[in-house]
Amino acid sequence: MTSPQKAILAGGCFWGMQDLIRKQPGVIATRVGYSGGDVANATYRNHGTHAEAVEIIFDPQATDYRTLLEFFFQIHDPTTPNRQGNDRGTSYRSAIYYLDDEQKRVALDTIADVEASGLWPGKVVTEVSPAGDFWEAEPEHQDYLQRYPSGYTCHFIRPGWKLPRRATAGQ
């Protein structure tokens, strides 16, 4: 049996990100928190330069990192710096926090495909950085939209959105 793998993604308010990602095939568990910033023991009221992020545990036999990233780019706008919908500020930036060189390679390759696809109107501004500490958010933020199904979100699945792979040299 293959061990579960982890991904850490930020794409705006973590409530909507978690709610959609948790429903994807192969996702075992999710939790929301703060990552990519400068404050130890980050909290909602004091998270410094951290982004609101989702930690995803997934079964690599049921899904892969690339598939998770494709979904990530479908449910948030990666072309708006420090913003998703009405949410503004560095907390709401688009970011991929990779855990190893392979995740970094897949992230950069997926971003190149997003850029080449023209599915988004502008240049992708998604930050790609090594994963640092992930500070779990307070209990009231975990599984928020499961507890409050009509709660706030600015994330949605875009029907018919399919990321093509770009043609690369040597194919």
UniProtKB/Swiss-Prot annotation:
* Active-site positions on this chain: 13
- Oxidoreductase recorded as keyword: yes
This protein's UniProt keywords:
Oxidoreductase
Cysteine disulfide links: none
Stated EC number for the protein is 1.8.4.11
Q: Per the record, what are the reactions this protein catalyses?
A: L-methionyl-[protein] + [thioredoxin]-disulfide + H2O = L-methionyl-(S)-S-oxide-[protein] + [thioredoxin]-dithiol; [thioredoxin]-disulfide + L-methionine + H2O = L-methionine (S)-S-oxide + [thioredoxin]-dithiol
Asked if Oxidoreductase is a keyword of the record, the answer is yes
* GO terms, biological process: protein modification process
Q: Name one GO molecular function term.
A: peptide-methionine (S)-S-oxide reductase activity
The record's listing under InterPro entries reads: Met_Sox_Rdtase_MsrA_dom, Met_Sox_Rdtase_MsrA_sf
Gene3D superfamilies documented for this protein: Peptide methionine sulphoxide reductase MsrA
The protein's role, per its UniProt record: Has an important function as a repair enzyme for proteins that have been inactivated by oxidation. Catalyzes the reversible oxidation-reduction of methionine sulfoxide in proteins to methionine.
The cross-references to PANTHER family, in alphabetical order and at most eight, read: PEPTIDE METHIONINE SULFOXIDE REDUCTASE, PEPTIDE METHIONINE SULFOXIDE REDUCTASE MSRA 2
Query: What HAMAP family does this protein's entry cite?
Result: MsrA (MF_01401)
Name the family the entry cites: Belongs to the MsrA Met sulfoxide reductase family.
Q: What is this protein called?
A: Peptide methionine sulfoxide reductase MsrA
Encoding gene (name): msrA
